[in-house]
């Protein structure tokens, strides 16, 4: 599917991939500080530990949401950073961001749009015709 999308739609379309990539990190972050506590502190905190772990996860989620909102202001295409963030087979351009990006460049907007559309189509063609690549790229990020 090829189309122009808004910043909000970019977040919605890429959110499942971001969740896949960030959930392991969120689990590590929420549990890491609890593991570092001395046993006495863990025992004293008792049931509060679980609640504090959940709060840590919520804080991470809030930070991730803010980061995605900022990234949505800067992304030009669905695969801008080289990762297949949108659902398989989805090519997308973000016209508002492209317009902002093109300001001050001494090129016609049509040339910029053609270049970005061709690059996005090339990314999607690569991910479509090399079936294992999408999963391998995402798995590599997850493993890191």
Where are these regions (language model features)?
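Cation-handling catalytic/transport regions enriched in His/Asp/Glu
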Residues: 93, 108-114, 132-136, 141
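Short pre-active-site segment immediately N-terminal to the catalytic Zn-binding motif
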Residues: 98-118
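Catalytic Zn2+-binding segment of zinc metalloproteases
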Residues: 120-137
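Hydrophobic transmembrane alpha-helix bundles
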Residues: 34-43, 104, 117-122
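Auxiliary, metal-adjacent structural segments of Zn-dependent hydrolase domains
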Residues: 1-96
């Amino acid at each position: 599917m090829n189309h122009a999308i808004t910043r909000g739609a970019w977040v919605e379309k890429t959110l499942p991939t971001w969740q896949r990539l960030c959930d392991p990190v969120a689990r590590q972050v929420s549990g890491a500080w609890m593991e570092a506590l001395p046993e006495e502190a863990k025992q004293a905190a008792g049931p509060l530990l679980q609640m504090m772990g959940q709060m840590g996860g919520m804080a991470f989620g809030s930070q991730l949401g803010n980061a995605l909102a900022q990234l949505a202001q800067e992304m030009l295409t669905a695969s801008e950073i080289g990762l297949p963030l949108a659902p398989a087979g989805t090519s997308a351009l973000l016209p508002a961001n492209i317009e902002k990006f093109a300001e001050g460049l001494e090129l016609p907007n049509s040339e910029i749009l053609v270049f970005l559309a061709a690059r996005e189509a090339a990314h999607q063609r690569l991910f479509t015709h090399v079936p294992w690549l999408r999963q391998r790229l995402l798995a590599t990020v997850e493993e890191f």
